[in-house]
Amino acid sequence: RGFDVSLSTLGFAIFASELSGFASPFAGRIVDRLTHRNSMVLGLVGSAVGCTIAAVSPSPIFFAVGVTVLALTKQSFDLGLGAWIADHVPYNQRGKIVGLTETAWALGLLVGVSVMGLITAATNWRIGFAFAVLCLIVSMFVVFNRVTNETRVLHESHSTTPQRVTGNSWLVVFTMFCIMCSAQNLFVTFGAWLEDEFHFGAARLAVAGFSLGLVELVASVSSSRQTDKWGKERSIALGSLLVIPGGIFLCLGSKSLIIGLIGVFIYFLGFEFSVVSLLPLATSLVPNSPGTGLGWVLGAGTLGRAVMAIVATHLFESFGVKGPALMGALFGLLGALTITNYRRVNAKS
């Protein structure tokens, strides 16, 4: 709210940035042709450029340009990392490794976002973005020096198999759409709810962000330990279903900080567990082209976030946090039903 604009206006800015994610399927094909190191470094460089634009932006429009560049180029890192895992880790162990990488992501949220919040409270949000640029530059050097630049490993031949998402695999893509729809409902309204209902400032919001980082850390560690044992599809369904009681808790306890936060924590625990469990499945959708399958899944997730960035902010302004909470719970149920149907159809084939 540093630009003194309404939440719905900011929602449109987020929507514009999320549109860049529609390039994920195309980006996935490119990543499958690049070395893992090049795709990851490219993503980090672009993310630093996007954060820089956002930090110096004089208006919401330029801010939207910055976060759009960030969202667009970050895909290269995400897809490159996913392709590296797919090329080096057997499928029956992939849930563990993806869970570990997502644990690192949760630690980044736990520490990085919290530090950015404290920096913002002490200075302003532009300095917070500058700190993010510094972290990205350090990450570039780490990846460049530690990841080899060898060409991609091609596994067994699939010359007769279409190198695209086909058939029942689209159910996995739609599941990611539903999961990200459910998550975005609270991602874009959680902070505003705390500000409006309980008068949270930047420092207290940073503490709340730190707490969410702990929740995501628990979910990622749990996924790395359980997803391969329970099965990817079952784990996705369980996580999606957990969103439902979280949304209901928040809806019923929106005027109580304790009850509301319990609902939020349950909500994000389910979301994070489901999405981490889905990523290893996404890398196997297209034989020999993990980036392509992952790209379609991430693109569907982007579509979900883009749509809900507008819908959720308008629901919040009309009904308070109850509207987004119930909408998110509905999409959690839809995601669980979709992945269960995928599992049932695959079991028959």
Language model features: what each stretch is:
Residues 1-7, 188-203:
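Short amphipathic helix-loop junctions that connect adjacent transmembrane helices
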Residues 24-35, 219-231, 316:
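Helix-to-loop junctions at the C-terminal end of transmembrane segments
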Residues 101-144:
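Helix-loop-helix hairpin linking two adjacent transmembrane segments in secondary transporters
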Residues 233-278:
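C-terminal transmembrane helical hairpin of 12-TM major facilitator-type secondary transporters
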Residues 290-317:
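A late C-terminal transmembrane helix in Major Facilitator Superfamily
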